[in-house]
Amino acid sequence: MNNAAKNIKAFEDIRSLHKKYGDIVRVGPRELSINRPSAISVIYEPPTRTTRSPWYAQVSNDVTKISLNSTRVLKVHKLRKKVWERGLSFRALAVYAPRIQAKVDLLLSKIANHCGRPIDMTEYAMFFGFDVMGDIGFSKDFHMLELESEHLAIKGVHESMLAIGVLGTVPWLLSMISKVPGAAASFSRFTTWCHRELQKKREDQDPRDIISWLLKALSEGDPSAPPGEIAIQEDARLLIIAGSDTTSAALSNALYYLASNPNSYQRLQAAIKEEFPGGINDWTYDKNIPYLDYVIQETLRLKPSVPGGLPRVTPPQGLMIDDDFIPGDTVIAVPTYTVQRDARFWSDADAFKPERWENLSTEKSPWIPFTRGQWACPGRNLAMMELRMALSHIALRYSMSFAHADASKIFDNGVMDTFTLTLPPLHLIFTPL
């Protein structure tokens, strides 16, 4: 916790420890960080015998009072995840796509208003991410892009993230502080907003957004529904936070790497223009543009939106990772940022090279930004849709560069680990093509 409080860069601290001490590093009284690709399948993929660690129990261990993400019992998680998968299915995404497109168009209009002048794309990517999730999550618009300002409820979320970065290594302390009157005042603005909007959504049982799928399941007595009133309130909060900050960070980071690597950006533009020779008016989502996906995958390799390892607990009998025995009841994790930048597993590991993915598979490489197995992020396809839409539209319309000589360094050095990445301003200048 001392290191976390100093610089809020736990992902870099963990990487440094592995460079110094090797593949297996003790990072807590009974906690190990394991920097090996072979550990990924053992820890995260079926038929793993690990379970989620106590870190996930910061709210409660009672499954009727927690979100899907806090659920530690595999059978319960597997059941509850089914309704989320309905709300995030390809069929559902087809319904959401025009609404996401509308937010992309609004984002592009704001970029147009700043043409030739610096614009903080960290801020506008955040506006975009939360506006999208407000719409497809609740059919509610935060109007952040329109007003070019942060909604008060969302500001409360971001004011609370610093505590997670510092205290998240001691989950019981974070839980204790959250119960001190006034200590969680900022976050309470967000919880109040979610509760109010959830009550409004109960009047609408037509699944036009993600939360209505959960409410429909609850009203119909579906076993996959959130198991109680508190559980669905927690799911509502999870929906907005998990679906917004992660995608926003990925979009900002992709723009950072493309501005830093003009040749990669030009290749992306050429790949998109080849599919849409008539420009933006020809654009459709159904075109397969491999290099666009390579850019996204490479961005998530170098700067995963959740950079730390996702902790699991070994079964009582322990388990083997290669030739190493890990005792039972030990918290273990593969450090995402570290394993995705290890030179043993990646050539020119710290370089942005989207073309490396021409001969690589996301499932066979040590690439885990969405994690693996039953606990994997159910929103992966939604995130990819948002990123493909936003990046392809920007590439079709604009060239871009950093606003000043130090903009790149300021952005790269200012990243903080608050479970998800908290990013500094990214000042870019866009020029119409």
Which residue stretches match the model-derived regions?
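Hydrophobic, well-ordered secondary-structure elements that form the walls
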Residues: 268, 299, 329, 352, ...
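Conserved cytochrome P450 K-helix/beta-meander segment immediately N-terminal to the heme-binding cysteine loop
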Residues: 334-360
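C-terminal helix/juxtamembrane-tail motif
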Residues: 418-433
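Short, small-residue alpha-helix embedded
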Residues: 246-259, 390
